[in-house]
């Protein structure tokens, strides 16, 4: 059963709260020993979240008005996706999922899983795409297990200066 009282496409006035959620998530990851999203703590945002909000690609999941979680669903691959997915990024068949983040006040309540389940229904019905593609640091076993447990197929690894990334996709 979902804890969300609403799921909304983020509006520009949500941007400050969204960026705070991302920074808090990056701080939590750092405390857990992960450098994923570390750039956010230096004021760098490779996904340009405010612009993604303006494009209508950011979805927020609320519980009684509070943001419990968020996700970015990009209909067009960004430069990172094109680097990582190479020729597949140009097939037009997929949504690229980025910045799945859960408010730590909701930890342990399957919020991430609920966001992913919502996404798997929303993408084919509303965005008319048949594949979700995503990546995460290979060095985070729990995160890789999270996606495998949701039946995402591991399709390879990509490397950049920040590390090695596991690539996952799910055909819907």
Language-model regions, residue ranges each:
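A short beta-loop-alpha structural element at the N-terminal edge
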Residues: 5-20
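Conserved beta-hairpin
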Residues: 55-71
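Conserved beta-strand-loop-alpha-helix junction that forms the acyl-donor binding cleft
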Residues: 107, 119, 133-144, 160-164
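Conserved active-site alpha-helix within GNAT-family acetyltransferase domains
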Residues: 113, 125, 138-156
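Conserved GNAT acetyl-CoA-binding A-motif
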Residues: 116, 123-135
């Amino acid at each position: 059963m979902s804890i969300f009282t609403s799921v909304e496409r983020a509006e520009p006035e949500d941007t400050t709260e969204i960026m705070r959620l991302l920074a808090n998530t990056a701080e939590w990851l750092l405390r857990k020993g992960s450098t994923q999203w570390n750039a956010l703590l230096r004021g760098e945002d490779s996904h340009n979240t405010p612009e993604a909000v303006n494009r209508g690609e950011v979805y927020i999941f609320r519980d009684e008005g509070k943001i419990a979680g968020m996700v970015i669903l990009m209909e067009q691959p960004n430069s990172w996706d094109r680097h990582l997915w190479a020729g597949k990024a140009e097939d037009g068949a997929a949504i690229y999922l980025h910045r799945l983040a859960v408010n730590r006040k909701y930890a342990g309540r399957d919020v991430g899983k609920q966001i992913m389940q919502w996404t798997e229904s929303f993408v084919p019905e509303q965005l008319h795409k048949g594949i979700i593609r995503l990546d995460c640091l290979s060095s985070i076993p729990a995160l890789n297990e999270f996606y495998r447990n949701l039946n995402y197929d591991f399709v390879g690894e990509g490397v950049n200066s920040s590390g090695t990334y596991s690539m996952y996709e799910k055909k819907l």
